[in-house]
Regions:
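Bacterial N-terminal signal peptides that target proteins for export
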Residues: 1-12
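Acidic/proline-rich low-complexity IDRs
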Residues: 12-15, 47
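Hydrophobic h-region of N-terminal signal peptides that target proteins for export
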Residues: 14-22
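Core of compact, soluble alpha-helical bundle domains
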Residues: 23-145
Length: 145
């Protein structure tokens, strides 16, 4: 190798090292405010029975595998809140196809989630940040006017 090539390689490696050294860590503040994974499991322990008890929500969830849904929601909330989880199934439109979910249905689910977050003592600011991260999903979930 020529001296010039060696210098370019050295400069490139130094640049890569500098970029790696300045990489921003994942912001897991919201995840921690929600109590981490144990807090999310506790939230779902409160949320799932409320969904089933709610007259408007019950038809959507009565035939769903509750344990599987709970695990997926914990993973989803973990991921969107900055936790270490990765949701493998991301096609929300496909998952909700055939359920005839209106904007009112979606909003009711959010209300039930807020009740659970209140019951768990999750600070209002953390609730708002979580809901802001989840809100864009309505475009893939709501499938009837």
């Amino acid at each position: 190798m020529t001296t010039r090539t060696t210098r370019w390689i050295a400069v490139a490696l130094l640049c890569l090292a500098a970029i790696a050294a300045h990489a921003q860590p994942r912001d897991d503040t919201l995840y921690r405010e929600l109590g981490g994974e144990p807090g999310l499991v506790a939230l779902m322990d409160d949320f799932m029975p409320r969904l089933l008890a709610d007259a408007r929500m019950h038809p959507f969830f009565k035939e769903v595998d509750q344990a599987d849904l709970k695990a997926k929601l914990v993973t989803q909330f973990c991921q969107v809140s900055g936790g270490p989880c990765v949701l493998k199934e991301t096609d929300m439109r496909k998952k909700h196809d055939g359920f005839d979910i209106s904007r009112g249905d979606f909003n009711r689910l959010v209300e039930v989630l807020q009740q659970s977050m209140d019951a768990r003592g999750i600070p209002f600011a953390a609730q708002n940040r979580l809901l802001a991260k989840l809100a864009p999903m309505h475009r893939e979930i709501v499938n009837v006017p």
